[in-house]
């Protein structure tokens, strides 16, 4: 005999939390993080965004280092972003600052960070590439990479702070590094939209800011280049037979 349930009453019982970490209304939409030296050059962009209805605020790295704790500067910045997400309900984060010099600067301070010679610090993962041929003597060529996803990945499952160092050994995002335990179970899902203007000088900041304002202040009809496109790509040599390489110059990738 087949029985069919036509109606059902469901009662949900739960305890309302004493504290809601996210306010009902947002105080800011966009927070810009940059060193104090870039503040004046960024002010036109802040004014432009506010005039467009995107509530924007600047937070300097100097302020963050004074107000927030962390094991290093990238973690201090990440704790500020977490605070801004919870207190201001921000939607976007714009990091401004790159490597100070391509010639004289040292991009990596230690296994985890580049801070000393960066206007805005970067987090290095400790993801080690395996050799292409495991039985060969080929050396590992990429011991870690820069990842700004670190700044956007604020929470683990369950709402805990995502440190990218789950085993607390002081090595962030470790995977495949000889002699180091892997950091398993990292979240890798961004909780806020984040980007970076990797500017190396005040002049570069001014140039980029002017371009952004100009782009957002004009319509497509005012931009003769708007319907033109340049595509730059490489050839993966999938069409290579011996030494006979054929290049496709007609199709789009």
Give the role of each language-model region:
Residues 1-253:
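Cysteine-dependent hydrolase recognition
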């Amino acid at each position: 005999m087949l029985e069919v349930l036509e109606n059902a009453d469901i009662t949900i019982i739960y305890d309302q939390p004493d504290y809601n970490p996210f306010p009902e209304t947002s105080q800011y939409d966009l927070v810009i993080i940059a060193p104090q030296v870039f503040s004046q050059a960024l002010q036109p962009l802040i004014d432009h965004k506010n005039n467009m209805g995107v509530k924007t605020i600047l937070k300097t790295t100097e302020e963050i280092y004074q107000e927030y704790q962390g094991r290093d500067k990238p973690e201090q910045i990440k704790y500020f972003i977490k605070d801004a997400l919870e207190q201001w309900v921000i939607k976007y984060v714009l990091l401004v600052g790159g490597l100070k010099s391509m010639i004289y600067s040292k991009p990596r301070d230690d296994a985890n960070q580049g801070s000393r010679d960066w206007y805005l610090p970067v987090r290095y993962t400790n993801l080690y590439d395996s050799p292409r041929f495991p039985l060969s003597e080929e050396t590992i060529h990429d011991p870690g990479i820069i990842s700004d996803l670190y700044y956007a990945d604020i929470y683990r499952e369950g709402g805990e702070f995502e440190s990218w160092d789950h085993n607390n050994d002081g090595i962030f995002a470790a995977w495949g590094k000889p002699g180091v335990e892997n950091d398993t179970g990292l979240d890798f899902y961004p909780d806020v939209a984040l980007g970076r203007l990797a500017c190396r000088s005040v002049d570069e900041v001014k140039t980029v800011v002017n371009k952004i304002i100009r782009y957002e202040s004009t319509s497509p009809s005012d931009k003769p280049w708007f319907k033109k496109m340049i595509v730059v790509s490489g050839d993966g040599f999938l069409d290579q037979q011996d030494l006979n390489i054929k290049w496709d110059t007609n199709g789009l990738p």
